Amino acid sequence: MSILINNGNDYQLNSSETFNSLKSSPSSTSSLSSISTSSSSSCHKRSKAVDLNRNTSNSQNSSISTAPTTATAANTTPRKTSITIPSKLPSSWIPLRNGNIDYSRYYNTNQEEDNQEQQLQDGEPLSAPTTNNGTTKTATANANIIQDSFETIPCFSSTTNTTITSSRSNPTNSTPTSNDPSFPKQMINWNQFLQEEKDMNDNSSTINDDDKTFYMEQLNLNVGQTPNNNNNNNHGVSETENDLLPGTSKSLIAKYHYQLNYGDENENETNDVREYEYGGGESRKRKSSTTSDDRRPRRGGGGGGSRTSQVFRNTLNKFTFKPKIK
């Protein structure tokens, strides 16, 4: 029997030998470290596979393993774009307390608005919204729901790994699916969102194709392209940040940011537009406006007192990890 190696060396094996040794031609500088074969009396069978592992030594003789092997044909399925989100991340990645994300490490947990205050306990996880969300303090049964901006930040509470799979055939209208019922479905028209982003930007900063690709890929919950941190990037995300959050994609966070900043704004025919003051009071004049009274809040918020925008920026910049792509 003759075995041909990639480098062209021809190894001869006499039929009388019992796989205890292997002799190669004198000109060869390579040798075999092991051969595994199944015991089959018929030729040309797939099960008679020979596994060749070349040794890096200069020895001309190498032992051969006689352990039989079984060749099993694996069923192949088309590759799916999916992401497995660990239920509990190692503490070296993000701060954890009793298996939950320690949000108190990143922002002030005292939130006040209209004489309403709710304290996020140290290490208490934020929860997905429920049907009985209110505008006042929650009851005991709904104690984990944080009011105002925090009540709509979705997080996973499952104890098993969560796999999210979505289709790329129609990214604008595709809806992510998950084996975790607590994961929120798509909740915004992204073409409208992108147009709103363009309207918000001034002449020196517009949403380009790279940014649109970033949003579309985030919508599909894939590891997308993070825009460079330059004039074309108003997302508050550095170039080195990862593109997914624990249980929440940046696109969903951006959706909530958009909803909280502009969801209650109503521009009527009388041009009676409210002046928005976030924290430092920094606001931006719309590009298409001719009056200084037509303003909207600058994305990302103002100074240190910005409650909504700064929290979302902290969320985007801090709660990141590298997901595993199957």
Curated annotation (Swiss-Prot):
Primary role: Virulence factor involved in pathogen-host interaction. Modulates host pro-inflammatory cytokine interleukin-1 beta (IL1B) expression.
The organism's place on the tree of life at top rank: Eukaryota
Lineage, broadest ranks: Eukaryota, Fungi, Dikarya, Ascomycota, Saccharomycotina
Record's compositionally biased regions (Low complexity): 21-42, 53-78, 117-137
This protein's record includes keyword Flavoprotein: no
Protein name (database record): Virulence factor CaO19.6688
Outcome of gene disruption: Leads to strong defects in host cell damage in a model of human oral epithelial cells. Exhibits reduced survival following co-incubation with a human macrophage cell line and causes more severe kidney pathology following intravenous murine infection. Also leads to higher levels of interleukin-1 beta (IL1B), following incubation with murine macrophages.
Keywords: Virulence
Annotated segments matching region Disordered: 19-91, 112-137, 161-184, 222-245, 276-326
Organism: Candida albicans (strain SC5314 / ATCC MYA-2876) (Yeast)
Inducers of expression: Expression is induced during infection and decreased by benomyl treatment.
